[in-house]
Amino acid sequence: MAPAPASPDTADADAPLASEEPQAPSPAASAALAESPAPDESLAARDPGGQDGAAAPPAGAARAAEPGFLADWPGDTRLTYTLGGNYRGELHGSARVLWQREGTRYHTAVQLDVGLLLSMHLTSQGDITATGLQPAVYEEQVRQRRRGVRLDEDVRLHNGQRVARPAGVQDAASQFVELSHRLATGQLSAEPGTAIPLWLARPGGVDEWTYDVVGEDTLHLPRLGAVRALHFRPRPLAKPRGPIHAEIWFAPSLQYLPVRIRITQGPDTFMDLLADTIEQQ
């Protein structure tokens, strides 16, 4: 999900937060994406039963019919971040991470705004299953350019190429929610030194990333104060296509939400997102 602070005209294919700088789609890519249905603009606007105009069931009945594993997933959540950093001088902006679910369907988005330098919007939609999130559509928009991935039995990349779909694969937006959920439900060890593999599908390819649990840090957040958070650092890919990497801090006291995200390209070029507010239904 990459928001590359290193250059306003360059984004990196290897950042686990995002994929490479969008390019004009090939005819094959345009045809491939055109074959797939467009993602829902809003889960709230979609009839849960899939029939327009059908009366919605009573709330109690709908909850009773939901699979039991949904109880482990949070309700609608919105995190806002203060964005700082450096690129030929100080950077200032804002960011937010959104999570919505309706039954077993989910929608999550990551948005960054650094004024004229960079704007980025990443979205993921798919299903919540007993084994975790199962993305179906991932799209990213960097400035005015948009690219996407469709995930079915296989993964259809932006250029139309189809590749195998690894078990448990996530995308650059869904990874934050999936990792939070695995931590909150005890599926992942938070012990320092733990290595956490995670497949990520992006417009340019599917790669297996490995996050190392570095340890636990005390973060001083603008409004939330001092918060202890687990520090996840990604290892470089075996065949790196650039120096960008994104580190994530998850707070155990705040449902393991990602309270800090730092995107780095070199010692003097970085963006640092610190959680400012958390809203949850």
Model-derived regions: residue spans:
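Acidic, serine/threonine-rich low-complexity disordered tracts
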Residues: 1-154, 192-281
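Anionic-ligand-binding alpha/beta catalytic cores of soluble enzymes and soluble regulatory domains
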Residues: 177-194
